[in-house]
Amino acid sequence: MLLAFVPLIVACGSTASKRPSGQGSLFTPSIASDSGHLAVGCGGTGGWSPSVMAAGLPGVLTQTQVQDAFTDLLADPKYRGELASSFLEEGPTTPWRVLRVDGDTYTLGLGRWTRKGPENGATVFEMRGHTGSWAWSGGGDCHLAPVLSAGSEWVHLTTLRQGLDRQSTHPSVGVTEQECASGRDPRPFLGTPISKETSTTVTGYWTATSPADNSSCVGRAPMNVSLRLASPLGQRKLLDGSTFPPTLVTRSSVAAGG
């Protein structure tokens, strides 16, 4: 999974016709090349534009409102112990920015965030309510990924033990599902890969149909599949678009199958 919340945070979903404030576009091939317009998130189907991560959405909550909210939550015996030792270690003055708003629910980024995401232990934090009546919904570490429509999941890309065929327009890579999928062979469930090519990088975006909810978390070795490029990889870096920002594709410690 992309994020394990402590406790469980409610996923923030919406339809394309009625987006909550701060949410960008769901990932589609047409915007794979423009990170300023896609939505990124830490899990679930909701997200926000990368452009709001450094300073947050303007004009939503004031410093006084948030400090008062943090003070109230830290005074609540239901939350005090966990919040004081984790999310709000710095107390009411913990740095924050608003990432997303869904009605009376606010998703905040705590700690240091930049346009590339959280840094140095920064977290996401969700609270709901209004001045004088706040409740904590959850939060956790954030491993950013572009947000997908419901029913799809990212697969992780790795290089094979023999390395990449840099002279081919169809270099082989390994794919691994990131959700619990009962150890299934992911290949029948893969979508069409999207490759964004520049003079220095090739970024692969590859998804699969999400497994059933009752899937077990039995793992399996990466499966051998081929990317389709417009020109040979050459000396360009191969990046995995299942993260934000995309990360360098590296060799798996487990031999690929298939």
Q: How would you label these PLM feature ranges?
A:
Residues 1-3:
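N-terminal export and membrane-targeting signals
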Residues 7-11:
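C-terminal motif of bacterial Sec signal peptides marking the signal peptidase cleavage site
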Residues 15-106, 110, 143-196, 243-258:
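Extracytoplasmic low-complexity, Pro/Thr/Ser/Ala/Gly-rich segments
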Residues 86-144, 201-252:
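Extracytosolic low-complexity repeat regions of secreted or lipid-anchored proteins
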